């Protein structure tokens, strides 16, 4: 009677002899703990998953669902893992681990291109482990390194992503990224990690220790990878180049975001209104429109903003700071966008043209205001008397009639006015 299969493990394509060898090695890898679902599951990041073809994706889904079903049938799994729930709903498996992947981004940057190229070239097959063979204890075959040969420069190759290593210890350490193994524990804080170096790095969060200091600007960092990334600001190094247009970037994540301009891909969709974005950060900010959340509040006047950058820009109104200076005329501005618009004055550039009368404007906001002349639209209405205006500034000026506010004082005689134009007219009396 043939053995009944219990666990199917997807792995990179190999010859029958190699498959048989891996099967034997797998049986020798029996450990002292019961089989858990994580022992026979494989995680993919979004980038890795998108490199698989339809057949490979289907095989992965079938094997994962079969493995879980078999574990349940012999009483080895009581709760349903999140990845199984996603697969049963027809969703992508990498969604369950997005936050983990994001957290490892700095460590995996150098692996990004190697993984993608390797996964595009490789195919999956299955190793079948029977109930009788396995007893009740196994470990994934991916943890079994290949035999080292003297002729190979980097003999230790990861069968999941194709990355190669000079040393067995590096290879084993790398495998824990795929399998989520965490052998190193920070006893003081009760958190586990896949590498000893990550324990040290985590402890620095609590101690505040930042041993990596930039000699250029003095800024300090808790881990070497963040320090290396920071140094690119000073060196101008941009190692990640777009093969489509040649534009280069400091970080792998920035290249990935940029490439979506060429592909038109917008994977982050708002479930409220359906609007899609190329970056998760853009979606995160967009959601605040629906929730009304404005977490960044000005301590000076209480005005709140959806973005931190908007708060910083606003605060310059109180401080009078204008860090963006025009090199052509010396005029300074409180925001980069205002300086960009100002540059168009020198260039004579007017990008925004009215289709009704062909009048052109430097800024889009000026065009929008101008178009209200043609449409007679007056969106700014006074709550006090109902009078409407085509500009927000006109409404503000009008409301001072009701409030009696006169913020513009004459320095010569102290008389106050409700609008700047009235003050300028008055000052003409003193100058003659």
UniProtKB/Swiss-Prot annotation:
Keywords recorded for this protein, A-Z:
DNA-binding, Metal-binding, Nucleus, Repeat, Transcription, Transcription regulation, Zinc, Zinc-finger
**Any one of the GO BP annotations:** regulation of transcription by RNA polymerase II
The GO molecular function terms of this record are: DNA-binding transcription factor activity, RNA polymerase II-specific; RNA polymerase II cis-regulatory region sequence-specific DNA binding; zinc ion binding
Q: Which domain of life is it from?
A: Eukaryota
Extract the InterPro entries matched here: KRAB (IPR001909), KRAB_dom_sf (IPR036051), Znf_C2H2_sf (IPR036236), Znf_C2H2_type (IPR013087)
Its main subcellular localisation, reduced to a broad class, is nucleus
A Pfam family name for this chain?
KRAB
Q: Point out which parts of the chain are C2H2-type zinc fingers, as ranges.
A: 156-178, 184-206, 212-234, 240-262, 268-290, 296-318, 324-346, 352-374, 380-402, 408-430
* Location within or outside the cell: Nucleus
> GO CC: one term?
nucleus
Q: Residues in domain KRAB?
A: 35-106
Q: Which family does it belong to?
A: Belongs to the krueppel C2H2-type zinc-finger protein family.
Its biological purpose: May be involved in transcriptional regulation.
Q: What is this protein called?
A: Zinc finger protein 829
Q: Which organism is it from?
A: Homo sapiens (Human)
């Amino acid at each position: 009677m043939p053995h009944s299969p219990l666990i199917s493990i997807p792995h990179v394509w190999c010859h029958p002899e190699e498959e048989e060898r891996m099967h034997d090695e797998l049986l020798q890898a029996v450990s002292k703990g019961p089989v858990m679902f994580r022992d026979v599951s494989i995680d993919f990041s979004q980038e890795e998953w998108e490199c698989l073809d339809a057949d490979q994706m289907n095989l992965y889904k079938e094997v994962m669902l079969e493995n879980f079903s078999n574990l349940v049938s012999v009483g080895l799994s009581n709760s349903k893992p999140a990845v199984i729930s996603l697969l049963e709903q027809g969703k992508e498996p990498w969604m369950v681990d997005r936050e983990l992947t994001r957290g490892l981004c700095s460590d995996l940057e150098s692996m990004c291109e190697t993984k993608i190229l390797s996964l595009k070239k490789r195919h999956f097959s299955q190793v079948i482990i029977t109930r009788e063979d396995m007893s009740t204890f196994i470990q994934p075959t991916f943890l079994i390194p290949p035999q080292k040969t003297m002729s190979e420069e980097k003999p230790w190759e990861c069968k999941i992503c194709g990355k190669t290593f000079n040393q067995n210890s590096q290879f084993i350490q790398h495998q824990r990224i795929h399998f989520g193994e965490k052998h190193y524990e920070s006893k003081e804080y009760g958190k586990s990690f896949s590498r000893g170096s990550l324990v040290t790095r985590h402890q620095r969060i609590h101690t505040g220790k930042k041993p990596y200091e930039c000699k250029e600007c003095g800024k300090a960092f808790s881990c070497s990878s963040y320090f290396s990334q920071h140094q690119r600001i000073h060196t101008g190094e941009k190692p990640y180049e777009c093969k489509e247009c040649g534009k280069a970037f400091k970080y792998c994540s920035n290249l990935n975001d940029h490439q979506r301009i060429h592909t038109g891909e917008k994977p982050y969709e708002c479930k409220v209104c359906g609007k899609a974005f190329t970056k998760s950060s853009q979606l995160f900010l967009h959601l605040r429109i629906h929730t009304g959340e404005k977490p960044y509040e000005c301590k000076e006047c209480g005005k709140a903003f959806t973005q931190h950058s908007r708060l910083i820009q606003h605060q310059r109104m109180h401080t009078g700071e204008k860090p963006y200076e025009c090199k052509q005329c010396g005029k300074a501005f409180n925001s980069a966008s205002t300086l960009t618009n100002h540059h168009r004055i020198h260039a004579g550039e007017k990008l925004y043209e009215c289709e009704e009368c062909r009048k052109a404007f430097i800024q889009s906001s000026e065009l929008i205001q101008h178009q209200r002349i043609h449409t007679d639209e007056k969106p700014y209405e006074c709550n006090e008397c109902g009078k409407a205006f085509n500009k927000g500034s006109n409404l503000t000026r009008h409301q001072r009639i009701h409030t009696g506010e006169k913020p513009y004082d004459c320095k010569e005689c102290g008389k106050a006015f409700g609008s700047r134009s009235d003050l300028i007219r008055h000052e003409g009396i003193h100058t003659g």
